[in-house]
Amino acid sequence: MERPNLPKELPEDIEDKKEAAQGWFQSLRDALCAEFEQLEDELAGPLSDQTPGRFVAKDWQRENGEGGGGRMSMMEGRVFEKVGIHTSTVYGEFSPDFRSQIPGAEEDPRFWASGLSLIAHPVNPNVPTVHMNTRMVVTTSQWFGGGCDLTPMLNRRRTQEDTDSVLFHRAMQIVCDRHKVADYQRYKAWCDEYFYLKHRNESRGIGGIFFDWLHSTEEAGGWDADFAFTRDVGRAFSMVYPRIVRSNFNETWTEEDRDEQLIRRGRYVEFNLLYDRGTIFGLKTGGNVESILSSLPPVVRWP
């Protein structure tokens, strides 16, 4: 999607808005960690004789304690082979070669960004991998961005008619339809366009929503409306994905299913390293490399 021309002005209470956004991302992180640990506890099918996983949190700082930092929460368990739920709040200056890619950064290279990112790689091939992130960015402009997308591991489940796909898309449509500043059809198409592996001519998953540069006019509700939608995206995800996990995580699987899962994970690696905007942003702004690359699956296979 073409990048819009965002207003080059910040509200007088921008610091209060930053604090509110940062606080929300941190509270959502804590709620999601609790929910994912609950899923670990509930498993009753294969591997239920193993110990449920628990998150291990690790705080980090940029540039010798300057420029902000974040918290990296990782879990390896019997439901999730690897799941990371991370928050960060960073600030500084964009490098000269990166400024032209960020709205408002060419006039002034200083930036502030806060957000949450989640990626889950389940053990059971019947349970789809998922990615979700929401963020607020401030330069000489300010905006929200984010999205959720679902990646089934098994080809027989990679259809728009699959129960998981229908449920996930419906949840995303409902949350968009509740907010005048959101546009479900546009965000759905944007997701399909964004999460596409051009070199393989295939989609990463079955889609979801993706949005960026969300800066609504005061007539449309302004920052408050954008923030309300961003919060609701997190809430919608926290309801729909655990439901999908619970409907699949007690199913059995075969060695062929596992092989298919590992090959599909390889596509995930390819996308994140070649195309993902968040990965590039994090590496370009001195983010925590361990946290940025934690989105990669733990075990992968290329045929």
Swiss-Prot record:
The reaction(s) this protein catalyses: coproporphyrinogen III + O2 + 2 H(+) = protoporphyrinogen IX + 2 CO2 + 2 H2O
Residue positions binding substrate: 117, 133-135, 286-288
Enzyme class, spelled out: oxidoreductase
PROSITE patterns: COPROGEN_OXIDASE
GO MF annotation, one: metal ion binding
Chain positions of site Important for dimerization: 199
Quaternary structure and partners: Homodimer.
Function: Involved in the heme biosynthesis. Catalyzes the aerobic oxidative decarboxylation of propionate groups of rings A and B of coproporphyrinogen-III to yield the vinyl groups in protoporphyrinogen-IX.
Protein name as catalogued: Oxygen-dependent coproporphyrinogen-III oxidase
Designated gene of the protein: hemF
